[in-house]
């Protein structure tokens, strides 16, 4: 199924019938979209689904005076005869990044699938192809720490609540705003799988969290032989030494 067609139907019933979408590779290896025609239907040529969605949003904005945005939509019924168009836009910039760690505290902490579906559609319409995908990282922490000898209550004591996930992701906070209920982990795993599936349908490249060395302060009780470095209260100073062998595990 064409995710752009499905997205257009979510915006407005029948909107997908007004666009013919053809995905074609680009000879110059850049992202591009081309708009042709008018009347009953506009033809969109693009190198991928995100470029096609961005091109359609361009047409809606500059030819139909419609507005689809993160702040709301003004999308009237399109005229029977669509305005004529012949345009091509291209870029050599291949990675369009979106979101930051704090987004997952301030904004998305309690989003459900319906809200995420809307956000991913808006990403595509905005030409975004490299969004952060941090939903459910706390479940990864849970599973990892359980493998390293933690009990579930101990894991929950380390993790923070949803409103503080940004700081957990950045590695400068633990044990604030929790504990998380058991159902939370299950729900977030299901939600993240839906998010990733939709992003990949569009051809997006989701960005995941890597391990950068932060561990619970209680890890020294589990692994007393490991060389752990406490976070000192200094600003903008690098204090870390070479990591212990436990880091590799």
Where are these regions (language model features)?
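Contiguous, structured surface segment used for ligand recognition
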Residues: 1-93
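Aromatic-lined carbohydrate-binding surfaces of glycoside hydrolases
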Residues: 24-26, 38-45, 49, 74-75, ...
């Amino acid at each position: 199924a064409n995710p752009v067609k499905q997205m257009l139907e979510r915006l407005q019933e029948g909107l997908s019938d007004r666009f013919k979408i053809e995905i074609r590779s680009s000879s110059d290896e850049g992202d591009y979209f081309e708009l042709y025609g008018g009347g009953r239907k506009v033809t969109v040529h693009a190198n991928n689904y995100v470029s096609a969605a961005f091109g359609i949003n361009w047409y809606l904005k500059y030819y139909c005076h419609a507005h689809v945005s993160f702040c709301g939509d003004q999308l009237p019924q399109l005229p029977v005869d669509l305005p004529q168009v012949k345009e091509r836009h291209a870029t050599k910039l291949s990675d369009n990044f979106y979101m930051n760690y704090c987004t997952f505290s301030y904004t998305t902490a309690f989003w459900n699938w319906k809200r995420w579906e809307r956000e991913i559609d808006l990403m595509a319409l905005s030409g975004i192809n490299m969004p952060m995908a941090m939903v459910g990282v706390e479940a990864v922490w849970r599973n990892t720490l359980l493998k390293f000898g933690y009990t579930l209550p101990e894991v929950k004591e380390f993790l923070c609540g949803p409103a503080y996930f940004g700081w957990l992701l950045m590695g400068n906070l633990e044990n604030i705003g929790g504990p998380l209920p058991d159902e939370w982990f299950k729900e977030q795993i299901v939600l993240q799988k839906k998010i990733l599936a939709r992003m990949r349908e569009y051809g997006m490249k989701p960005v995941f969290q890597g391990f950068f060395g932060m561990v619970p302060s209680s890890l020294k009780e589990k692994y007393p032989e490991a060389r752990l470095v406490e976070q000192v209260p200094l600003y903008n100073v690098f204090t870390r030494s070479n990591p212990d062998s436990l880091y590799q595990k």
